[in-house]
């Protein structure tokens, strides 16, 4: 889940997707040709479709382990006079939001688990930026829970800028372009097969004006989503989860929920199985169609909705009695989760190919999973109902 050929998410960068849904120790979302559509759902977003096939590289500094978590990973120029409140810039406020999201989710998970604590790893980069991984394993309720945050400063080549701005004046030939990227990403795997897995990720990317073209426009975009992967369907749980996502979306635009729900269904598709990883949620990418302030507020609202969408379901299901059969089915569905992340997830596959920070890249994987040869649940069973919903996505609300 969670290095670029910007030096990799660890730190070099061959773009293949502007925003992979997962977040690593460096900006893994910088891994695709900018503005290049890559799924049907992306096409439905009515984005431009230039044909760029080049590969580019960018540079960021190598991360260095540190012993304590700083108040912020921002450069001093991005922080203003009060680090705790941060500057009025979108960079500063998004960085603050992703730290608060990590803290609040970790506290909620520890409380729900009843005793286990997160292990924390922190790193920084000499020129600014850094990251913080929080991972809980073998708790009373959670088999594995990871919540990662990252801030990256780097430089992209002019080819990437031209791809991002195909309508710019062709006579403008900008030089290397500094960029900023920040995000929070999490995957939560409970032990009880009746409690669902949850993934969420929210991120922001911004360029500075090119060094050789100070008048050129600055680029920015948001991406992210929250999705839900149960092993067994409790309709009240699925409706609750989707209702919280819809409520967050509807505060900003009534078109967001249906648009982003479809995008989520399309993205989390396991092609070789012809089924979805789970029961959906919301997903958006390369998103700058609206005012920047509005989209910052929208991303914040979505991140703040994670706990009310998920924790009540975990509290309801964590102590439900289960059998070995239930656990085996959960492990088979965990196998599907592993397949998607290692084969299709853009952040994971990019990080593995570019020598990224492996512990952050693989933090999304469950501790245990299972594969059985030619396993098919009997039609009409609870297991079959879940599989059918993954093959034939439904409208839950």
UniProtKB/Swiss-Prot annotation:
Substrate binds at residues 185, 201-203, 355-360. Residues 135-144, 337-372 are annotated as: Important for dimerization. GO terms for biological process: chlorophyll biosynthetic process; protoporphyrinogen IX biosynthetic process. Residues 79-90 have a biased composition (Polar residues). GO terms for cellular component: chloroplast; cytoplasm. One of its GO terms (molecular function) is protein homodimerization activity. Pfam families: Coprogen_oxidas. It is found in: Plastid, Chloroplast. It catalyses: coproporphyrinogen III + O2 + 2 H(+) = protoporphyrinogen IX + 2 CO2 + 2 H2O. The keyword Oxidoreductase applies. The keyword Transit peptide applies. Keywords: Chlorophyll biosynthesis, Chloroplast, Heme biosynthesis, Oxidoreductase, Plastid, Porphyrin biosynthesis, Transit peptide. Its EC number is 1.3.3.3. Homodimer. This is Oxygen-dependent coproporphyrinogen-III oxidase, chloroplastic. It comes from Nicotiana tabacum (Common tobacco). The gene is CPX.
């Amino acid at each position: 889940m969670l290095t670029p050929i910007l030096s990799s998410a660890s730190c070099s960068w061959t773009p293949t997707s502007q925003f992979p849904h997962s977040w690593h120790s460096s900006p893994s979302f910088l891994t695709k040709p900018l503005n290049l559509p890559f799924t049907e759902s992306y096409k439905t977003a009515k984005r431009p479709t230039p044909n760029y096939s080049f590969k580019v590289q960018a540079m960021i500094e190598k991360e260095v382990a540190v012993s304590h978590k700083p108040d912020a990973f921002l450069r001093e120029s991005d922080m203003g006079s009060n680090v705790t409140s941060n500057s009025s810039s979108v960079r500063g406020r998004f960085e603050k939001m992703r730290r608060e999201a990590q803290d609040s989710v970790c506290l909620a998970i520890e409380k729900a688990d009843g005793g286990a604590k997160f292990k924390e790893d922190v790193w920084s980069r000499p020129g600014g930026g850094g990251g913080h991984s929080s991972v809980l394993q073998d708790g009373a309720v959670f088999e594995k829970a990871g919540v990662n945050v990252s801030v990256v400063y780097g430089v992209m080549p002019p080819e990437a800028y031209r791809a991002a701005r195909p309508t710019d004046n062709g006579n403008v030939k900008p030089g290397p372009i500094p960029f900023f990227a920040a995000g929070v990403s999490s995957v939560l795997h409970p032990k009880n097969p009746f409690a669902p897995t949850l993934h969420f990720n929210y991120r922001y990317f911004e360029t500075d004006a090119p060094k050789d073209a100070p008048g050129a426009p600055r680029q920015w975009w948001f991406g992210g989503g929250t999705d839900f992967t149960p092993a067994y369907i409790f309709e009240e749980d699925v409706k609750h989860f989707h209702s919280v996502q819809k409520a967050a979306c509807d505060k900003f635009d009534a078109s967001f929920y249906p648009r982003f729900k479809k995008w989520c269904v399309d993205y989390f598709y396991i092609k070789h199985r012809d089924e979805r990883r789970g029961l959906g949620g919301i997903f958006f990418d390369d998103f700058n169609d609206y005012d920047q302030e509005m989209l910052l507020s929208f991303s914040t609202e979505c991140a703040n909705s994670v706990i009310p969408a998920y924790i009540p379901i975990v509290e309801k299901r964590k102590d439900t009695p289960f059998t070995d059969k239930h656990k085996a089915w959960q492990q088979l569905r965990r196998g599907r989760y592993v397949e998607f992340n290692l084969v299709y997830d853009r952040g994971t596959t990019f990080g593995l190919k570019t020598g990224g920070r492996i512990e952050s890249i693989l933090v999304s994987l469950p501790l245990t999973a299972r594969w059985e040869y030619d396993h098919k649940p009997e039609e009409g069973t609870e297991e079959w109902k879940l599989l059918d919903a993954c093959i034939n996505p439904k409208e839950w609300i």
